[in-house]
Regions:
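Glycine-rich FAD pyrophosphate-binding loop
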Residues: 5-27
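N-terminal glycine-rich dinucleotide-binding loop that anchors FAD/FMN and/or NAD(P) in oxidoreductases
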Residues: 26-62
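N-terminal leader/propeptide and maturation segments of large enzyme subunits in energy/redox metabolism
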Residues: 59-122, 130, 328-331, 337-383
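An anion/pyrophosphate-binding glycine-rich loop and adjacent beta-alpha core
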Residues: 59-71, 252-367
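Conserved redox-cofactor binding core of oxidoreductases
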Residues: 90-206, 226-228, 275-276, 381-400
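A glycine-rich dinucleotide-binding beta-alpha-beta segment and adjacent secondary-structure elements
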Residues: 187, 369-452
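Glycine-rich loop(s) and the adjacent beta-strand/alpha-helix scaffold that form part
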Residues: 203-206, 210-279, 283, 465-468
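Internal hydrophobic alpha-helix adjacent to the cofactor/substrate pocket in enzyme cavities
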Residues: 252-261, 363-366, 371-374, 461-478
Length: 478
């Protein structure tokens, strides 16, 4: 919408909820981007991650032409970097490769390419409108440190969604973009095969009709629609969700009624680390904790998997535990660097202990086993070698008291399937043809993430394709 407004177009945004933000405002991680100046401010210590990705491509995706070609390009780049290591190693192609491997090769390569190629520029664009995300960290499924996060006035990492969304909203207000809150769109007006407006219903039931030269669907996924989730993936019946109430899938329904094709509707992600309170409320615990050094232990007080693997694999490992849950463990040094963790503590999500033994007692796990687990992990960090589970991202030892743990379990988080689009964010019909005047961006679309989304790619998705959809819609409205 900002891009379309910058092009001089009159914009109306229909929002089904009473406030802007949807799932995005709940995002606690950050935004992936490759080859940024912010990355170059970090020392490179992720060689093992790059080597592991190249090995995975060769061993598990040799029959995937896109992944094989990307791996060959990255291998050439990696060899050149090792011969002359300047700056921080990353590339657009490595981000593509990570995303394709994370998505099990089911992604649309053209969309992945657009995502990665435009990611660094999107970081600069955010900065230009007042949203700086310059703290770079590690996240699951990424070969290198690529996730960009905001920091607060104290220099501590803070939640990306609660930071970015108000800035986006202010920029829209400054551009006189009209918001209609509590207004649910329910039909795309079509005329002669073209999208020419929207029909909607207000909170009190009154009808709203908006005539337009271009329509952009950015309604999010369907993770809060339990019936729809169960329809496409029955095994997720009864799972809690991290999603905002508005994630009902209505945008997908409207688009298909207008002739749009869909893809990957059964690809639904469960996030591995969600804290569920006794009243059933689910709270997303950011993947950034694991990227910054946290570990997972089970009811026996033992580690059981590579914590920074992809979300699908970590979730499966947790579900395989007898109680389908685990403990996420951090130390005071991590708390001191993160306003997000401080928020979890304030909200009462944690148990704590001045020693490993005290924390184990608070968690209800065997003290000797847990203490041994912590000592073994700290030794692995010092050696930068995890012989138990092959983790390649270490940060610092968990050795600064007091210690904290959060009980977590997987919950429905992201729907990778949705409306079929092309790299211009044009909505396509079943024949692969663009529907004139109709565009889509973000979680309502399918194809970007394949069978599994990497943490940090959702924000990249909605910023990159949000900009593209606004530009395309504005061009169409000339």
């Amino acid at each position: 919408a900002i891009e379309a407004a910058n092009a001089g177009k009159k914009i109306v945004i229909l929002e089904s909820q009473a406030m802007a933000g949807g799932n995005s405002i709940r995002s606690t991680g950050g935004m992936n981007a490759a080859k940024t100046p912010e990355q170059d401010k970090n020392s490179f210590d992720e060689a093992a991650g790059v080597e592991k990705t190249l090995a995975t491509a060769a061993e598990k995706f040799a029959d995937n032409e896109t992944i094989t070609a990307l791996a060959a390009t990255v291998k050439s780049q990696w060899d050149a970097y090792q011969a002359n290591p300047q700056g921080y190693f990353d590339s657009v192609e490595l981000m593509e490769l990570d995303t394709m491997i994370g998505g099990k090769g089911k992604n649309n390569p053209e969309l992945v390419k657009a995502l990665a190629e435009n990611s660094a520029d999107a970081i600069e664009w955010l900065a230009s409108i007042g949203a700086e995300v310059k703290n770079v960290g590690a996240f699951g499924g990424a070969s290198v440190k690529r996730i960009h996060r905001p920091v607060n006035a104290d220099g501590k990492v803070t939640a990306v969604g609660a930071y970015i969304v108000p800035i986006l909203e202010k920029n829209l207000q400054d551009r006189n973009v009209q918001f209609l809150f509590d207004t649910t769109a329910n039909e795309i007006i079509m005329k002669d095969g073209k999208a020419v407006g929207i029909k909607a219903t207000g909170k009190d039931g009154h009808k709203v009709t908006i005539n337009a030269k271009s329509v952009v669907i950015a309604t999010g996924g369907f993770g809060a629609n339990a019936e729809m989730v169960e329809k496409y993936k029955p095994e997720l019946k009864g799972f809690a969700t991290t999603n905002a109430e508005g994630a009902q899938g209505q945008g997908i329904d409207m688009a298909t009624a207008a002739g749009a094709a869909t893809v990957d509707m059964n690809q639904i992600q469960i996030h591995p680390t969600v804290h569920i309170e006794e009243d059933g409320n689910a709270h997303l615990i950011t993947e950034g904790l694991r990227g910054d050094g946290a570990i997972l232990v089970n009811a026996e007080g033992k580690r059981f998997y590579d914590e920074v693997s992809t979300r699908d694999k970590v979730s499966a490992a947790i579900i395989a535990q007898p109680d389908k849950s685990a403990w996420l463990v951090v130390d005071q040094a991590m708390v001191d660097k993160s306003a997000v963790i401080a928020g979890y503590i304030k909200s009462g999500y944690t148990v704590t202990g001045a020693t490993y033994e005290e924390l184990a007692k608070a968690m209800g796990v065997d003290e000797a086993t847990f203490t041994s687990t912590m000592n073994t992990w700290n030794q692995a960090v010092e050696a930068k070698s995890d012989t138990e589970f092959g983790r390649t991202s270490f940060a610092n030892p968990l050795a600064t008291a007091p210690y904290y743990a959060i009980k977590i379990t997987p919950a429905v988080h992201h729907t990778m399937g949705g409306i079929v689009i092309n790299p211009k964010a044009e909505v396509l019909n079943e024949k692969g043809e663009a529907i004139s005047g109709l565009y889509a961006a973000g979680e309502v679309t399918g194809g970007v993430h394949g069978a599994n989304r990497l943490g940090g790619n959702a924000v990249a998705d909605f910023v990159v394709f949000g900009r593209i959809s606004g530009q395309s819609a504005a061009d169409n409205a000339k």
